[in-house]
Amino acid sequence: MQRTSRLKRELSLLAAEPPPGITCWQDGDRMEDLRAQILGGANTPYEKGVFKLEVHIPERYPFEPPQIRFLTPIYHPNIDSAGRICLDVLKLPPKGAWRPSLNIATLLTSIQQLMAEPNPDDPLMADISSEFKYNKPVFFKNARQWTEKHARQKTDEEGMPGSLPEVGGSEGPSAAQKRKAGQLSSGGKRFCPDV
């Protein structure tokens, strides 16, 4: 019951006063299944990209964090090829920082901030993390190419936005990206736990 009343309030607030570059809405009839969209920030390799996310609200919300994953493929050290996100506020303590006082808007804003400022010391994608740390020009080039390929609004003949590719679709992650997801590098790097 608490989940339903809180979700209604949060969705109403998100509709009335959405954070800049973020939208969130109910997906179908089930209130616990939401969709969100984050616009890539200016001066980032994700600029002009439109990134769709899936948000599932657990039964014990707000005492458990929502489960959020990217549907749009993204080249990022903290987001894997399945769209899973390594971010402390998406996990319960002691390993995470979720608190019942946080809300969906806060989480989406935190994800938007992570897009702008990756954390290469807590990666899901070891190779991309190394690239970000030691060869930023290559990282930015690759991230821009992925954004162009997967997250740019396509228009039809009449100039109307078309649909965006989703993970697992015909334009999903490349075989190389899937391989990177399975590779762990040595050297004492810490990898995102419990994702």
Curated annotation (Swiss-Prot):
Domain of life where this protein originates: Eukaryota
Gene3D superfamilies, sorted: Ubiquitin Conjugating Enzyme
Crosslinked positions (Glycyl lysine isopeptide (Lys-Gly) (interchain with G-Cter in ubiquitin)): 91, 180
Ranges of compositional bias, category Basic and acidic residues: 146-157
GO cellular component terms attached to this protein's record: nucleus
Catalytic class of the enzyme: transferase
Pathway(s) per entry: Protein modification; protein ubiquitination
Active site: 86
Primary location group: nucleus
The EC number(s) this enzyme carries: 2.3.2.23
Places the protein is found: Nucleus
Covalent cross-link (Glycyl lysine isopeptide (Lys-Gly) (interchain with G-Cter in SUMO2)), residues: 189
A Pfam family that the UniProt record links to this protein: UQ_con
Post-translational modification: Auto-ubiquitinated. Effects of auto-monoubiquitination at Lys-91 and Lys-180 are unclear.
Keyword Membrane assigned: no
Region feature Disordered, mapped onto this chain: 146-195
Family to which the UniProt record says this protein belongs: Belongs to the ubiquitin-conjugating enzyme family.
Stated role: Accepts ubiquitin from the E1 complex and catalyzes its covalent attachment to other proteins. Catalyzes monoubiquitination. Involved in mitomycin-C (MMC)-induced DNA repair: acts as a specific E2 ubiquitin-conjugating enzyme for the Fanconi anemia complex by associating with E3 ubiquitin-protein ligase FANCL and catalyzing monoubiquitination of FANCD2, a key step in the DNA damage pathway. Also mediates monoubiquitination of FANCL and FANCI. May contribute to ubiquitination and degradation of BRCA1.
Protein name: Ubiquitin-conjugating enzyme E2 T
The organism of origin for this protein: Bos taurus
Gene it is expressed from: UBE2T
